[in-house]
Design a protein with these regions (language model features):
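Short amphipathic alpha-helical interface segments
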Residues: 12-23
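A short alpha-helical element within helix-turn-helix/winged-helix DNA-binding domains
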Residues: 27-37
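Alpha-helical residues within the helix-turn-helix
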Residues: 34, 51-52
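Short coil turns linking two alpha-helices in DNA-binding domains
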Residues: 39-42
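Beta-hairpin "wing" of winged helix-turn-helix
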Residues: 54-69
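Conserved segment of winged-helix/HTH DNA-binding domains
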Residues: 72-97, 108-118
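C-terminal regulatory/oligomerization modules of transcriptional regulators
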Residues: 97-161
Length: 161
């Protein structure tokens, strides 16, 4: 199974959460931990890493906290993964040459490179704005389904009088 590690998943959740909030409101590690239900030490670690990679900007002081370093539409999922996991690739050898003893005789290396490039390209085309747009659409759909499932207070079940 190909998947992100848990910290990267949490990092994407944090970045999407920060992107949904007003830009002028800095987020503290504690407020983000409370709002996302993630452990405070994990949130602190992720905020530091994301700041070091200039995806978040940090502000010290009484009104300090974290904000996006750029607009949500210019931060890609690929950048977040790169900041938290390193280079994106399908296999280790498709990212760093010379790691595998079979590299020169490998029958699938070129295909691994093609898959890695396609994966990276796809992730470079999904932004925080895209993630939040999809989330807002899902929340609206859920709300509409919930409203549709509620029967009016004056309705009588069929066959009961």
């Amino acid at each position: 199974m190909f998947r992100l590690n848990k910290l990267t998943d949490y990092g994407i959740v944090l970045m999407a959460h920060v992107a949904r909030s007003p830009e002028e409101t800095p987020h503290t590690a504690r407020s983000l931990a409370n709002e996302t239900k993630l452990p405070l030490p994990t949130v602190g670690k992720l905020l530091r890493q994301l700041s070091e990679h200039r995806l978040l900007s940090s502000h010290r002081g009484v009104n300090g906290g974290y904000n996006l370093a750029r607009e949500a539409r210019s931060i890609t999922v690929a950048e977040i993964i790169l900041a938290l996991e390193g280079p994106i690739g399908f296999t280790e050898c498709s990212v760093v040459k010379g790691l595998c003893n079979m590299e020169h005789s490998c029958a699938i290396m070129s295909n691994s490179q093609i898959i890695g490039d396609a994966l990276r390209d796809a992730l470079e085309h999904v932004t925080l704005s895209d993630l939040n747009h999809e989330m807002a659409h899902h929340e609206r759909k859920h709300d509409q389904e919930l409203v549709a499932s509620i029967k009016p207070a004056g309705s009588v079940a069929e066959g009961v009088r």
